[in-house]
């Protein structure tokens, strides 16, 4: 069965749950990936650039999860979990946005992991500002959009799937 790369917005607590239980459900069953609608949206750019735009959407969704305000350990660090899932569990939802996909079932395991990206400590202040501004940015406020853009421009550290236990323990 063919597999596709899906970017799952997450939080540090979700990483800890994945390490502890061996599986995790994508919040509300949503993920982001290179979909036909996203490819059609871009008139130029290679596959990697298009995939990066889907990744950025997942990192913005991570900010929305952080905006809920229930993250105790790292309330200002975005997390994106990259997984390779069977095509059969993925349904593109262009009505929700070009890179948006619905996952059924929404659950994935550590075996599906391809990569983990987490904000570095130096990005926390910028991400904190973006978290406060993200809803206002959605309404078109230019200053809020700039704050969110500043956070999206920040480097997220890459971790190999085998580093998950150390990432959870040492951070």
Predicted regions located by residue number:
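Short, extreme N-terminal segment that most often corresponds to the first beta-strand
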Residues: 2-28, 33
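Short, structured protein-protein interaction patches enriched in aromatics and acidic/basic residues
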Residues: 30-44, 71-89
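Intrinsically disordered, low-complexity boundary segments flanking structured domains
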Residues: 14-20, 63-70
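N-terminal interaction modules that seed assembly of large macromolecular complexes
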Residues: 22-66
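Glycine-rich, aromatic-bearing surface loops/beta-hairpins
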Residues: 74-76, 83-171
């Amino acid at each position: 069965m063919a597999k596709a790369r899906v970017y799952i917005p997450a939080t540090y607590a979700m990483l800890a749950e994945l390490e502890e239980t061996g599986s995790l459900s994508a919040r509300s069953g949503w993920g982001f990936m290179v979909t036909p609608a996203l490819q059609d949206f871009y008139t130029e750019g290679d596959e990697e650039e298009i995939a990066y735009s889907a990744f950025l959407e997942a990192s913005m969704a991570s900010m929305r999860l952080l905006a809920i305000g229930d993250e105790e350990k790292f309330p200002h660090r975005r997390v994106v979990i990259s997984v390779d899932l069977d095509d059969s569990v993925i349904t593109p939802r262009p009505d929700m946005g070009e890179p948006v996909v619905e996952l059924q079932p929404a659950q994935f395991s550590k075996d599906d992991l391809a990569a983990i990206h987490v904000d570095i400590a130096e990005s926390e202040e910028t991400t904190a500002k973006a978290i406060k501004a993200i809803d206002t940015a959605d309404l078109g406020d230019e200053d809020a959009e700039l704050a969110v853009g500043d956070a999206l421009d920040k480097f997220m550290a890459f971790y190999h799937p085998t580093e998950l236990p150390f990432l959870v323990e040492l951070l």
